[in-house]
From Swiss-Prot:
Key words, A-Z: Chromatin regulator, Dioxygenase, Iron, Metal-binding, Nucleus, Oxidoreductase, Plant defense, Repeat, Stress response, Transcription, Transcription regulation, Zinc, Zinc-finger
Lineage start: Eukaryota, Viridiplantae, Streptophyta, Embryophyta, Tracheophyta
Span of zinc fingers (C2H2-type): 1167-1189, 1190-1214, 1220-1244, 1250-1276
Listed name of the protein: Lysine-specific demethylase JMJ705
Cofactor info, note text: Binds 1 Fe(2+) ion per subunit.
Residues noted as binding Fe cation in the record, renumbered to the chain: 244, 246, 335
Biological source species: Oryza sativa subsp. japonica
Length: 1286
């Protein structure tokens, strides 16, 4: 019997076609001279490597000695856990494989391992794991595998049954020796300096590469692990790092010390939004919205094969990193990879000047998921630009520069930084000039000694040093509790490093006030709309009282509808004084930035205060006097929640006689204007960092009221003071004159009555037809419910009626004191401050306070000098600054307290749809699994289509094609030219959006030049609200160009083929927000540029002003003659063309010209629904089919309904149809649903139908949501009682 032959060796795993055709990222081999400066070299290769997303750099020097590397690694591991005897490190378990039960196949489980390894132990563990993995894949361990073989096996294992590997990641430390203390020699001395022996002696040493010269991260005030200091990574075979993008879209530098290779995959930044959409659909099952997709990708647990990306039209590339090589990832590029075996590497971030182009957008996207910012890109820009400006260094961080080197060696990065610095200061100057049109001042914060070197040079020597600021550089969730811990009160109740809110004593608050001087550094004053940390200037907006009253009684939908109406104010009684088209704010000449401006001052011991105190109320020194009178004349609203008071007084005379006053504590809480503490909620939530509060809310905690009421006491007089005190106060109201002209209120205070009763003794109304005069007398017996009485009777006599017109409830609602949420102060960047002020102007107006850094005037002066040196011309506006006094500092404290509050639906910024944090938290709700709640900033940052936006058709972009198919190039990525039909729809849309942006730029420039000589009218603030572009543009051009505020209603019909309509279409495009993927950075093609130049020249020729006025007839005749001349010119051109033709072709052309007749215009085909009772029609059959299947055909919605009737009602959501109007006289609100109108009517009628039947409670509620919340929080449930009885 023959022995059986030995088993044949397994054949090599076939490489799939998608992997074989995957582009390879570029590899660069710099010379020793190029390798000297890492930032300059990365900036040099960035234009060629950024379209790949990643690249490899092979250094010209050998790696450090292995002995020194192992020694440095051991010291780093020992520093992680000093208690351990051996230098060990922890690991994490990672799953490789596919679990069929998971609804989100892209998410891989990761959990912390209980084992700790030294480096040799983990190397042996990695070897054993490699053998078991290859055995499971039917490969012998002795066989040598190529990088492609590793990739094939990894993706095959990812689709097979789950296996577990270990990975040591995110460990602070480095394998390089510490950097030398002495600075690098200047460039002119480098040739004579000693040459570096190995990589550790160069500027590419990972311990200091983040703070190398030219990197913006060198100006970060404190070290952040993984960003400014390196982190170590130790892996084994198939240890993976998930798809992710760097924090703030920074560059990253990754070095491999030793071991097996790593495979990297990269997606360029231009395709980032398309990548996220593919991950959402294929990796997460399409059950999350784009915002949650971005947040989930930030958790670094998403692994998905590049095969899915390639099939979806996403550019993707690969590279293999070996020991001793660097991998550079560029801003905004997604990347992932895995290890081929045991290896050890480290990574750190850098920031070249090119990062500044996209830093703003990256900060907005980070703020959209409520992640705290680690750095302000404006701060880094200012520090780097000013460090280049000054010749003499203020400390050791800046380099000395000779004038000769500066003239001869002007780095491209330096020029870019200086231009962006000047552009940013110019934009701030332009916006400040528009916000300060009324002659007010910009408040300068007190100086803080903790700034960058460039800003420290600007400080004068006599400024005092302040307390050290709180670092806002939180790099992980683990650091968040530590940061909040240092900001919370200690056991003794003293608050450290925060502004005290427990006292009104200014002497006690002085230290806390001074601690607020570094607000712009601490990141506490970030824009509510976009989340940007404004480094130089911020604006604080607070709605006026009339605006706040309207915001209290309206919902967000009605407000947005009213804001969309152009011209006029919503409130008839809104005091909107205008001067030269600019909102006139109630400022005085001495204090121009008042936030709380009272119309009249009342003494604390006035009769109004005494009477209010007699009714159990708390006298408020800052309360409006008219509101005090209303509280007195209409009883105690809190005691009668079901009553509805109709009041309309303009002038009021009140006289009171007080026999005795006593101090009595009040059982009611009043709103606190000057101080507040965070009392509600779980322990440990008291923190100065608002991002921690937003994080608490996102985890399910929602505070009842972030502001607790504080009691105010009234000083009591001695009992022996029995003399009568009378005083008469005349108050002029600012509201409508509906009721009486004058009112006399007589108050007598006596003691002895203990009952609480409200009885009308006498009411007489006498009127004469001639004089229209009448008298009303009311005697009301009022007694307090506690201790002793305050008033025996109140007599109100009314005379001199203007008419018999009844007083309306709308006036009573307009005089109610606004609540905290409707009058809260919010911080905005200057750009969004103008937009928000325009919105508030439509419903009553707002008050503004502008705050800037103490050195900002000098920064502006340096920008002027730098602009003159670079030859940039700009007409600088004069800005008036003033030092912050104690009153301004109190307001800044109030701003900080308001910023601490967790946003709720009653916040006025939420109702206007401009609160980024609220929208981000709302997007986490299960109601928004597939579609985000609309927020203009978030939609723009994540490339989503606005519900109200539709594409604009451009005749200028059309070119008649005969039979040749139009070929559109989408872009060039990963070394390949991609057509529009080969890429993802997000990328295919880039050409259209690029043309729209180009048309926007041309038209804005054209119309700005046209109206440059005209005076600035009502649109001055609108013109100033142009979006501050993150990309570098010509400063002279950007200073003259002002766009329109997006979001306005535009005409989206297809215009006719005429030159005037072309201009109209371009003008429309300048106002429409064209939804496009964020981060588009393609160069404009020559075709678009040429067409833009031709169109621009045509418009400039047409706008030449006429030398003399002409009549309409002459204009028409000249227009007709111009058309005639154009026709003659066209005929002449056609005739010359015919003469050049051969005789036969000429005859055929003439015959065709005679026979040719104009074709009728094509009509759009509509597909109507034939279901009974439905009259809807659609453009495509697909939409009609979905509609008949009771599925919403609107893109991004796709909701399914049980009947066609509900689908027709759902249409109101997209069309914003509001057929139901409020029947109350004077109210213009409209509603989509009947229940919404029913609940709104209760605001007018005062009806509170929901009563809590819990013994001892008896609270009433107006809305069922409030009643449900009350039962849920207190446990007062009727069902529990029924169960208990049964």
């Amino acid at each position: 019997m023959r022995p059986s032959p030995p088993p044949a060796a397994p054949a090599a795993e076939p490489v799939p076609p998608w992997l074989r055709s995957l582009p390879v990222a570029p590899e660069f081999r710099p010379t020793a001279a190029e390798f000297a400066d890492p930032v300059s070299y990365i900036l040099k290769i960035e234009p060629a490597a950024a379209p790949y997303g990643i690249c490899k750099v092979v250094p010209p020097l050998p790696p450090p000695p292995k002995k020194a590397t192992f020694s440095n690694l051991s010291r780093s591991f020992a520093a992680l856990h000093p208690d351990d005897r051996s230098p060990s490190f922890p690991t994490r378990h990672q799953q490789v494989g596919l679990c069929p039960r998971r609804t989100r196949p892209g998410l891989k489980p990761v959990w912390r391992s209980s084992h700790r390894y030294t480096l040799p132990q983990f190397e042996s563990k990695a070897g054993a794991t490699r053998k078991s993995l290859l055995a499971g894949l039917n490969f012998p361990a002795s066989r040598q595998l190529t990088p492609l073989d590793h990739e094939v096996l990894f993706w095959r294992a990812s689709a097979d049954r789950p296996i577990v590997v270990e990975y040591g990641s995110d460990m602070s430390g480095s394998g390089f020796s510490p950097c030398a203390a002495q600075p690098q020699p200047p460039p002119q001395q480098q040739p004579t300096a000693r040459a570096a022996a190995h990589l550790g002696e160069t500027a590419w040493n990972m311990r200091g590469v983040a703070r190398s010269p030219g990197s913006l991260l060198r100006f970060m005030p404190e070290d952040v692990p993984g960003v400014t200091t390196p982190m170590l990574y130790v892996g084994m075979m198939f240890s993976w790092f998930a798809w992710h993008v760097e924090d703030h879209d920074l560059h990253s530098l990754n070095y491999m010390h030793l071991g097996a290779a790593k495979t990297w995959y990269g997606v360029p930044r231009d395709a980032a939004l398309a990548f996220e959409d593919v991950v959402r659909e294929h990796g997460y099952g399409g059950e999350v919205n784009p915002l949650e997709t971005f947040a989930t990708l930030g958790q670094k647990t998403t692994v998905m094969s590049p095969e899915v990306l390639v099939e979806s039209g996403i550019p993707c590339c690969r590279l293999v990193q070996n020991a001793g090589e660097f991998v550079v990832t560029f801003p905004g590029s997604y990347h992932c990879g895995f290890s081929h075996g045991f290896n050890c590497g480290e990574a750190s971030n850098i920031a070249t000047p090119e990062w500044l182009r996209i830093a703003k957008e990256a900060a907005i996207r980070r703020a959209s998921i409520n992640r705290p910012p680690m750095v302000s890109h404006y701060q880094l820009l200012y520090d780097l630009a000013l460090s280049m400006r000054f010749r003499e260094p203020s400390n050791g961080e800046m380099e000395t520069r000779s004038s000769r080197i500066k003239e001869k060696k002007k780095c491209e990065g330096e020029q870019l930084v200086k231009k962006m610095f000047i552009q940013n200061v110019i934009e701030d100057n332009e916006l400040l000039s528009h916000l300060l049109n009324d002659g007010s001042s910009c408040i300068i914060l007190p100086a803080n000694a903790h700034d960058g070197p460039g800003l420290s040079t600007l400080r004068s020597t006599d400024q005092s040093n302040m307390n050290s600021r709180i670092s806002h550089n939180l790099c992980s969730r683990e650091e968040a509790p530590e940061a909040s811990g240092c900001l919370s009160p200690n056991r003794n109740g003293d608050t450290r490093n925060c502004i005290s809110s427990d006292t009104h004593n200014m002497e006690g608050d002085k230290g806390d006030i001074m601690s607020a001087t570094g607000l712009l550094d601490q990141g506490l004053l970030s824009c509510v709309t976009c989340g940007i940390l404004s480094f130089s200037c911020v604006a604080v907006l607070k709605p006026r009282d009339s605006t706040a009253r309207y915001l209290m009684s309206a919902d967000s939908n009605s407000i947005n509808n009213q804001l969309s109406i152009s011209g006029g104010s919503i409130l008839a009684d809104a005091p909107t004084n205008e001067r030269n088209g600019v909102i006139s704010r109630p400022y005085s000449e001495h204090c121009c930035n008042e936030i709380m401006a009272d119309d009249a001052e009342i003494d604390k011991n006035s009769a109004l205060d005494l009477l209010a105190f007699a009714h159990g109320g708390q006298p408020d020194p800052e309360e409006d006097p008219l509101e005090k009178i209303l509280k007195i004349a209409h009883g105690i609203n809190k005691s009668q929640p079901n009553s509805s008071n109709n009041v309309g007084c303009v002038g009021t005379k009140l006289s009171s006689s007080s026999t005795e006053r006593q101090e009595r504590p009040s059982s009611q809480n009043a709103h606190c204007n000057g101080s507040s503490v965070i009392s509600n909620g779980p322990k440990g939530v008291r923190t100065r960092n608002k991002y921690q509060l937003k994080m608490v809310l996102s985890e399910g905690f929602q505070a009842k009221d972030i502001y607790s009421a504080k009691e105010k006491k009234v000083q009591s007089e001695p009992s022996s003071s029995k003399g009568d005190v009378k005083e008469t106060i005349d108050v002029s109201g600012t509201e409508n004159d509906v009721g009486c002209k004058s009112t006399t209120i007589s108050v007598s205070e006596h003691r002895g009555s203990t009952k609480n009763m409200y009885s009308v003794k006498e009411k007489k109304v006498q009127s004469k037809p001639s004089s229209l005069k009448g008298t009303v007398k009311e005697t009301v017996d009022v007694s307090g419910t506690e201790n002793d009485a305050r008033c025996k009777s109140i007599t109100i006599s009314v005379s001199e009626h203007r008419g018999s017109t009844p007083m309306t409830n709308s006036l009573a609602a307009s005089i109610v004191k606004p609540d905290k949420d409707s009058s809260r102060m919010h911080v905005f960047c200057l750009e969004h401050a103008i937009e928000v002020e325009k919105q508030l102007h439509a419903i009553g107006g707002s008050n503004i306070m502008l705050i800037c850094r103490p050195e900002y005037p000098k920064i502006e002066a340096e920008a002027r000098l730098l602009g003159e040196e670079m030859g940039l011309v700009y007409d600088w506006k004069g800005i008036h600054f003033k030092e912050a006094n104690m009153e301004d500092r109190q307001k800044i404290q109030e701003v900080l307290r308001d910023e601490e509050a967790i946003p709720t639906s009653s916040d006025w910024a939420v109702k206007l749809g401009i609160n980024l944090y609220y929208s981000a938290n709302l997007a986490k709700s299960p109601l928004y699994n597939k579609q985000m709640p609309y927020n203009r900033v978030i939609y723009r940052a994540f490339g989503c289509d606005s519900p109200n936006d539709s594409p604009v058709m451009f005749n200028t972009c059309e070119r008649k094609q005969s039979h040749q198919k139009k070929i559109v190039v989408a872009g060039r990525w990963c070394g390949k030219v991609w057509m529009s039909k080969q890429v993802h729809p997000y990328l295919a849309h880039r050409v259209e959006s690029q043309e729209a942006e180009e048309a926007d730029r041309i038209c804005s420039y054209h119309f700005d030049e046209k109206h440059k000589a005209e005076p600035v009218g009502n649109s001055s603030r609108v013109e100033a609200s142009k979006r501050k572009s993150s990309s570098l543009t010509d400063v002279t051009e950007s200073s003259n160009r002002r766009g329109e505020i997006p979001g306005e209603e535009t005409n989206t019909k297809r215009p006719k083929h005429s030159q005037e309509n072309n201009l109209r279409a371009l003008e429309t495009a300048a106002e429409v927000v064209v939804p496009s993927p964020a981060g588009t950075g393609l160069r404009v093609s020559s075709r678009i540029a040429n067409r833009a130049n031709k169109l621009k020249s045509k418009m400039e020729k047409e706008d030449v002003p006429s030398s003399r006025p002409k009549s309409n007839i002459k204009e028409k005749s000249s227009h007709a003659s111009g058309q005639k001349s154009n026709v003659q010119e066209a005929n002449a051109n056609s005739a010359s063309h015919l003469r050049a033709m051969p005789p036969k072709q000429k005859a055929e052309a003439e015959a065709k010209k005679q026979i040719r007749t104009p074709k009728p215009p094509k009509q759009a085909v509509e597909y109507s629904c034939d279901i009974e009772g439905c009259s809807m029609s659609f453009r495509t059959k697909r939409d009609l089919s979905l509609h008949k299947s009771d599925i919403c055909p609107v893109k991004g919605c796709g909701k399914k309904f049980f009947s066609h009737k509900y689908l027709l009602q759902h249409r109101k959501v997209h069309t914003d149809d509001r057929p139901l109007t409020c029947p109350w006289k004077g109210c213009n609100m409209a509603f989509k649903w009947p229940w919404a109108r029913t609940e709104h009517l209760r605001v007018h009628t005062g009806d509170r139908p929901y009563v809590c039947h819990e013994p001892g409670c008896a609270q009433t509620f107006r809305f069922v949501s409030d009643f449900s919340r009350h039962k849920r929080k207190t446990g007062h449930s009727v069902k529990k009682k029924k169960k208990a009885k049964s």
